[in-house]
């Protein structure tokens, strides 16, 4: 089986490595990724994507693409005569590209479709307080994330697990699912099931707007929102007109309580830093103020010199 793998971030790397280890006629003929990113320093070499680095380590051919809709790209894909195209965290492919695969093109998606269709399924699942998620492989079709499902694998979301941690776990779970999906396609027993659009939910791209913290919410909701955006792009608020990124929190009550404090108030109690939501206090554990390095919230609290007093955060 001739396989083309398309992907960019770390999420795609375990799948590439797992396919490369299959042997027995499962051959990666090309790895497609985005173009190298220029670094901030003028003298530094451009940065290759994680999947390109992994592909080169495996001595696999790599093609960097700028525009997947360029007709020339479809011609390049066709020239490799792929039996299957495997996509993991890549761009939206046009039919002219994915139709080049003789046995079909499938995507590895980090949710239990039709839940959380879109660019940020892991983040939104945690932000919404889900206790379970998983991965799905499905055949590509023109509408994004709507193709027929080949395989799914569920996993529980731990109460304190953040998006960065969960993405790593799902990438490894997904690699096993990708391998089994390829085996089923090769054996011509890849049974599929259509998605029920009535059960669909969205996971839109993360932006500066939808990652800002609204403190007028219950602390459990705030905790989920913050861990769902950690460590990147991170949830944020403002403090003294500067951006304050919040990386880690825990549900904890301070000894010095100010029950009438408005939402968004900061409190330092016994060296710990808390912020008030709509129904109580949330302990902050790790953060970063604009212009400074990431730090433990306790270190930030020591610089405030306001033990037992409530300050307005936003």
Swiss-Prot record:
Alphabetic keyword roster: Protein biosynthesis, Transferase
The residues the record assigns to binding (6S)-5,6,7,8-tetrahydrofolate are 111-114
Q: Which InterPro entries match?
A: Fmt, Formyl_trans_C, Formyl_transf_N, Formyl_transf_N_sf, Formyl_transferase-like_C_sf, Met-tRNA-FMT_C, Met-tRNA-FMT_N
Task: Keyword check for Translocase, yes or no.
Answer: no
Which residues does UniProt call coiled coil?
A: none
Gene Ontology molecular function, alphabetical: methionyl-tRNA formyltransferase activity
Q: Which reaction does it catalyse?
A: L-methionyl-tRNA(fMet) + (6R)-10-formyltetrahydrofolate = N-formyl-L-methionyl-tRNA(fMet) + (6S)-5,6,7,8-tetrahydrofolate + H(+)
A GO CC term assigned to this protein in UniProt: cytosol
For this protein, what is the EC number? 2.1.2.9
> Which Pfam families would you find in this protein's record?
Formyl_trans_C, Formyl_trans_N
Q: What does this protein do?
A: Attaches a formyl group to the free amino group of methionyl-tRNA(fMet). The formyl group appears to play a dual role in the initiator identity of N-formylmethionyl-tRNA by promoting its recognition by IF2 and preventing the misappropriation of this tRNA by the elongation apparatus.
Q: What family does the Swiss-Prot or TrEMBL record give for this protein?
A: Belongs to the Fmt family.
* NCBIfam families for this protein: fmt
Question: What name appears for this protein in its UniProt entry?
Answer: Methionyl-tRNA formyltransferase
Q: Which organism is it from?
A: Chlorobium chlorochromatii (strain CaD3)
